[in-house]
Amino acid sequence: STLDRSSAASDVYKRQYAYSAVYYPHGVSTNLDGSSIVIPSSSIALRTFAYNDQVAFPWFAPAGFQRGVVTNASSVGYVDSASGEFKAVSLNEGQRDSLYSNKINPIANFPARGVNVFGQKTLNANTSALDRVNVARLVVYIRERLDDIVKPFLFEPNDAAVRADAKAIVDRFLANLVTQRGLFDFVTVCDTSNNTAERIDRNELHIDIAIQPVKSIEFIYIPIRVQNTLGQVG
């Protein structure tokens, strides 16, 4: 039916953009011959991802003054459609907030701090931790590593001993992510509760995982209370 097709299309959209992010604006960089060129915001973001992974881990937010430093653009702005010239843009706090509320990660030039990526929202349509880049990259990392970690269990006997070994190796991997500040906690299940007789007969091994990812600080509140001279501060 039309409703079914619409629902299916919506599901595809959510899956397609759950791990996507948008950045604004573009930037000016230097070409190999020394000339100035305009580079897309995606190029700036990817360079920032690479820098983040050099100094931290993929599950740290590639944004802010610590890991969001832009090293491949001297200024940010847009190309004017009428003149074809690059127009520098200095996003103020209100403009940055407006962009961020619409899931657009601002790239801004800060006085005495230079150009920095100042947001890390994804286009995830659902309300979940996957609406942040650091969590999305964490999940991608976990999926890729687990794919390698469990491969040695292919064609092994699907019995209690192998299931215990599989759970143990996954637990060690996830425990390491807790140490490396990627996860707060996790739970894994690999026993007869999720490896039923039917699944075993289909030659399948199931390892169910639930994770609590570490989230980044994006808002800081410091309330200050002023006391009179005779008042007690407490």
Spell out what each predicted region is.
Residues 1, 7-234:
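Structured, hydrophobic secondary-structure cores that serve as assembly/anchoring elements
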